[in-house]
């Protein structure tokens, strides 16, 4: 009887199964909303508030400007990372992660911070901005310095200097070899470009390397036969440097 779609009992069982599925989905969503690794948006805001961490403003909006300037808030990924650093900020000994947390909390315009100690009692904190090529303004450096040198945040024995990270701009000249027979070359190239941006944007950090293998792997989207990077040399920034892709070009070679 249940094999018949017209059987009322079959419809009743399907309805009950669907209701159960919705219930389990709701339970799963509520569960992940209480996990830092998976919580998003307002759920993440409420979760990290338990650690006295709040979402920062990256760019102040101005509706009176022409054109209007939108308000840009800290991303979920950045807030999640900073919230995890908050535990290190509880230390009064001045560990590296505590300096990173305080520097990034000073202003939402700080994308990354890297502290180093060139000599005993001296701490250099390099700052990378979230806007432009990453070079911080003098105002941003001053704001971070004032925040970091507060006696309630850093050890009195530390002499803190806030400096701008050195930005290493680079360009990418990419050749994608795509078979003539197959999906649209434009579709394949668009997917390769999307995958490229997914790997170069997160690597816009202080001291993070940009190797050839990473780029080629990302560009090998389905349908790409071969990838060539013209005149490429791996970029290995020091602890005070950050790589930044200023421009990239993608050439299609249909074969």
What kind of feature is each model-predicted range?
Residues 1-92, 185-255:
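N-terminal polar alpha-helical/low-complexity "assembly arms" that mediate subunit docking
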